[in-house]
Regions:
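Non-catalytic signal-transmission and effector/linker regions of two-component phosphorelay proteins
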Residues: 1-5
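Conserved SAM-binding loop
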Residues: 6, 31, 82-83
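Two-component/phosphorelay signaling modules centered on CheY-like receiver
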Residues: 10-32
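Residues immediately C-terminal
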Residues: 12, 55, 149
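CheY-like receiver
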Residues: 27, 40, 45-126
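Short alpha-helical segment
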Residues: 35-39
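Conserved binding/recognition cores within well-folded domains
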Residues: 116-167
Length: 167
């Protein structure tokens, strides 16, 4: 089941986005009014729909959407789709690794197309079989996306992963 976060300072927009997401897929959908709430949630989200202009007038201490995306990117590879009225941040959005950038008012057909592509990418990543290697007399399963690179050392292959090396 997909874990999806929707973060927008306007409650009607959050509810509208939730309805659109529910038309596209099933999953656990969590709603957030600001970036601070989203960042405080320990859930490992697969997909995050994020407004850039989160209302900082009410609480200037809260991060805007771009700052929130940067902090998310430090700890997660969740797909981020910006949903905003601000055209001027489109290139900066891709600098933080956004999957897509949708402009308000939302074109429902475009939203569905982007969601379909995002869901396919998430599911294909989740369905990758781990690499099984023999280490000594034991078999070890290594997630493919955890492998950084392989190195040949005296007729042995050394896999360097995000967590450790495997001979």
């Amino acid at each position: 089941m997909l874990k999806i976060a929707i973060c927008d300072d306007e409650q009607p927009i959050r509810e509208y986005l939730k309805r659109l997401v529910e038309k596209c897929t099933e999953g656990e959908i969590r709603l957030f009014a600001d970036g601070g709430e989203l960042l405080a949630d320990p859930t490992a989200f697969d997909l995050i729909l994020l407004d850039i202009s989160l209302n900082r007038e009410q609480n200037a201490a809260e991060p805007d959407g771009m700052e929130t995306a940067r902090k998310i990117r430090e700890r997660s590879d969740a797909l981020i789709i910006f949903v905003t009225a601000l055209r001027e941040y489109v290139f900066e959005g891709y600098d933080v690794g956004a999957f897509h950038y949708l402009l308000k008012p939302i074109d429902e057909q475009k939203f569905t197309e982007v969601m379909d592509r995002a869901i396919c990418q998430i599911r294909s990543k989740k369905n990758v079989e781990p690499l099984v290697i023999k280490v000594g007399g034991n078999y070890v399963r290594i997630p493919v996306d955890d492998i950084l690179y392989a190195e040949n050392q005296a007729r042995k292959i050394m896999l360097h992963t995000k967590s450790k090396k495997e001979p």
